[in-house]
Swiss-Prot record:
Active site location: K203 (proton acceptor)
Catalysis: reaction(s): sn-glycerol 3-phosphate + NAD(+) = dihydroxyacetone phosphate + NADH + H(+)
GO-annotated molecular function: glycerol-3-phosphate dehydrogenase (NAD+) activity; NAD binding; protein homodimerization activity
Motif position, Microbody targeting signal: 352-354
Organism name: Trypanosoma brucei rhodesiense
Protein name: Glycerol-3-phosphate dehydrogenase [NAD(+)], glycosomal
SUPFAM superfamilies assigned to the protein according to its UniProt record, in alphabetical order: 6-phosphogluconate dehydrogenase C-terminal domain-like, NAD(P)-binding Rossmann-fold domains
Amino acid sequence: MVSGVTYLKRGAVFGSGAFGTALACVLAKKCESVSVWHMNANEARVVNQKHENVYFLPGAPLPANLTFTADAEECAKGAEIVLFVIPTQFLRGFLQKNSHILRNHVVSRNVPVVMCSKGIERSSLLFPAQILEEFLPNYPIGVIAGPSFAIEVAKGMLTNVCTAAADIDMARKIQRIMTTSDGSFRCWATTDVIGCEIASAMKNVLAIASGALKGLGTENNARAALISRGLLEIRDLTLALGGTGEAVFGLPGLGDLLLTCSSELSRNFTVGMKLGKGISLEEIKRTSKAVAEGVATAEPLERLAKKHNVHLPICHEVYNVLYANGCAKRSFKKLNSCKLADEGLPALPRTSKM
């Protein structure tokens, strides 16, 4: 049993996709009741009747103390911790409509707020926690990041993640709330918030590259090289944006990159596999219920790297394949034909050569 964990009466989760549902299952072990906001009232009723999120996480029975609701205010009322797991590109719209609810029921009671969404907003090039900060200025916001496939989390399989906040005491507070007493979901605290957000976004783009390698017929050696060089790209952007780098070689960076780049449970990896086999992005979108996060992230990541003059060669080639009529085979040939260089682990970001 893990000592020092915190129990609450009520938790709230905004966002009912696979990961949001999985985190709600974790909270259900720590709270007397958990409410999950789902945008469709009819679907919320179906989930409550079946005790299973048949829309986004089938096969994982939901705890009896977990309920879905389409009423954002009902979800927030009385919550002692609030998690956000709304897709990044829809987060601002939700906050524009419902930020008053957060101010009335969350901020006024000094409730911990934790961002669990991953990606980069196209219009602003902001990360999810930065978007939330615009609506809750000067309010402490935490982040959860790390290797965590939703189905495994929901089923209580062993998972380790990081809780991050600018104030280490806040990160540790969230850590105590989210860590389960049986240790099946364990959190490690850090202050490298921007590092966690960058790693969470970039690993999805790099997973597309890894899947494309698989689709092209390569095996383990090539994937190991891609993960290693991809990790340096995460590090370079993290340092350029003011991160400490602590998260890069821990669970949010190396841990999540290893997981997402190596398993067909990752939607990003499977999208990459299809691209590597020559299937177009349009066809992938047409035949998929949910598009992988890395597809939406690759374009704003390309612009963010240029803005900060950081060279991200692998992520750049993913962008080319997705949005510039590129070809996976040509992109990897280009990457493997680059000028010979030292391995090196420079302390400062490499300057852009794009």
